[in-house]
């Protein structure tokens, strides 16, 4: 028996053991559970959201009692909207009531209607069961899924018991989605998102809600997880534009301290929506996000910048990422109604200034052609030395800013043999970063975090190990290859020196004294193990690779 067969049998046995523990139920096969021990009595230790507390809860305050009475009075209004959904689904009244808050007993049916889960179930009868069984037999990430399930919402009464009912349902959903969407497969954030759906939806409904959330253009959440998704880069550019125009002092300080790309709150945007804040505020933000769509992402980050403006201007280069993440989470440690009030005001202000994220437009009926790309309306990155261009005329069918190809600016002209001249262009606002479009068929070069939906599919098989990336599979990440400026000049130079080209093919890779490994993480503080993957705060560089890497 060779090594491959031994490894395959070992993985199959490990997968069967994990599945068997969940089938047996609560705390099966674990003599010592590292997680919190479940309570046997939950008399006065559980709040209205289902969070289990260590001590007995105090009596309700006058404000909490008033909020409960308010939810009861609003229930009839939400029931009326669900009964006449065609009338209210695109109305302003739905948005207004979403900011005020959904009653808890209405949240499940409303999420199901917003994500159209019933229609998906009717179109795909029995498919969830098929995907679930296939995932049990052939999942490649079942160990990671099991580890993440064990740490998801453990303070909630539904997920308190190890190998309990809700943990088993969460495992089944993640295994089924890995088989349903191989492009995304499994990412760490998906366990938190699916757990939120399981709080209010049955197992199969929660699965189709997850499918619809990542597949919908309205929410654009797959761009955070897909290898070719450009949501992160588009939000980064849009955020830098909005902050530079509304808070120039804050952006100027970040440019001065070289914090433009390192301290972006978008790196922990997913964590803010699913982890790190109170469950009540998380659900309120999810309500707004499901109703408003991707437009709500930018106002959320803008509020954090506005609240933390004074602290940001005092942030130095020493450990900026860890300090900023802590302060960004502290932004939400306040009253839920106050946060939603500021969020609504920020949404209106950005809409007036045309700084919000435009909702995806619907193409013309009967036409399968792609939507036209509008002129840039302030979507380019504004860093030191850049000036804001006047807004262009809007197109008939606008689309999200990150779906458009980045504007190109000429950088240099390189003479090549035969009299031809190649003009190197870069996206505006990313001067100094080579164009990823040149990476096709070119020599190997440095790695840059740069992605656009209009880019061709590039190799993303980077496999990095280390303390920073212990639980994250970079084959499912958004890292792409780009060519350094030196490598762009290599084809012309090798054409003039054919002997050197042959000699360089057999040259050994260089080993720098300050690089013990091929990759070096530039993040000054590792991501917290409880957070999602920080997609915007890392920067990797490679040493010179041997040919054929």
Swiss-Prot record:
Ubiquitinated by a CUL7-based E3 ligase, which leads to proteasomal degradation. Palmitoylation is required for membrane localization and protects TBC1D3 from ubiquitination. One of its GO terms (molecular function) is GTPase activator activity. The keyword Kinase does not apply. InterPro entries: Rab-GAP-TBC_dom, Rab-GAP_TBC_sf, Rab_GAP_TBC_domain. Residues 101-293 form the Rab-GAP TBC domain. PROSITE patterns: TBC_RABGAP (PS50086). The keyword Lipoprotein applies. It holds the Pfam family RabGAP-TBC. TBC1D3 is encoded by a collection of very similar paralogs with multiple copies of each paralog, some human genomes encoding well over 50 copies depending on ethnic origin of the donor. Acts as a GTPase activating protein for RAB5. Does not act on RAB4 or RAB11. This is TBC1 domain family member 3L. It comes from Homo sapiens.
